[in-house]
Regions:
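Residues lining hydrophobic/aromatic ligand-binding pockets adjacent to catalytic sites
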Residues: 1-268
């Protein structure tokens, strides 16, 4: 068995007007942007699936345009997570997962379930949601990541539930939202959201060095000592884990360069 999992870094999406003149080659047709982007970074988080519904031909097209080894993380549709009673999300979840996501095949990465900042932790209702998460869709294995954005989740019980259902808690490097570094699944999902367009590589060189070091620790199956855990008494099994690190939101113009700079550090 490999001593480390695979580390992939990327950004959110591939269509963003400022990238037309900063990231993409001059005069590159928009129809070629995905092909180009997927050859500069090994993964992309797709935000469009949160707002819109797509059909199988779209996922087939995305799979065909990206190279072998590339992985898409998909943000789960908002109708699944933006509801008062999470335990009633089953129909919406089945509709989203059954829309054709499995057509991505081995290019399907984690499904990111993002919860509203107003959604507070209700143990019973949240467990009812976790029980709905399927292990497979049309024969393709699914990996689930949970991004919570309310401080009420900073409790041991949340980490215990995520661990019970083998879902990964998203680590958010964010100015306002909770940062929870407990390892609860067999992969790691981090969203880096405090970058700046004033930095050529989104984060400072020191910040990128620190995130590269943490990514290596995670990939080896360990846990960075400098990140907060809500249940520090419970250690995850030491085993290789794939790591997904995305540069999101703040510093978006420079996000692709942050992802590439991080991958360069990891290759050195």
């Amino acid at each position: 068995m490999s001593k480390s999992g695979t580390i992939r870094s990327g950004m959110g999406g591939w269509t963003f007007e400022p990238w037309d003149t900063s990231f993409y080659p001059d005069k590159l047709p928009k129809a070629k942007q995905l092909q180009y982007a997927s050859r500069q970074v090994p993964s992309i988080e797709v935000n469009g699936t949160y707002y819109s519904s797509f059909k199988e031909p779209t996922f087939v097209k995305w799979a065909s345009e990206a190279p072998d080894g590339f992985v898409y993380s998909l943000k789960g549709n908002r109708f699944v997570t933006n509801r008062r009673v999470l335990g009633e999300a089953g129909e919406s979840m089945l509709r989203f997962l059954g829309s054709g996501v499995a057509a991505l095949g081995d290019k399907l990465g984690p499904i990111l379930w993002q919860f509203a900042p107003t959604k507070k932790f209700d143990p019973d209702d949240f467990e009812a949601f976790l029980k709905l998460l399927p292990e497979k869709q049309d024969g393709v294995a699914l990996r689930h990541a949970l991004e919570v954005r309310n401080d009420s989740f900073i409790v041991q019980e949340f980490a215990a539930l995520a661990r019970k259902y083998k879902a990964a808690i998203v680590y958010a490097d964010h100015a306002k939202y909770p940062d929870i570094a407990d390892v609860t699944g067999d992969f790691i999902y981090a969203r880096l959201q405090t970058g700046s367009d004033d930095n050529p590589d989104c984060y400072t060189p020191k910040g990128l060095d620190e995130w590269a070091a943490r990514a290596r620790i995670w990939a080896e199956g360990k846990q960075p000592a400098d990140l907060r855990r809500v249940d520090p008494a419970t250690d995850a099994p030491v085993q290789p884990r794939d790591v997904f690190v995305y540069f999101i939101t703040e510093g978006k113009v420079r996000a692709p360069f942050g992802a590439m700079a991080l991958m360069k550090r990891l290759a050195d």
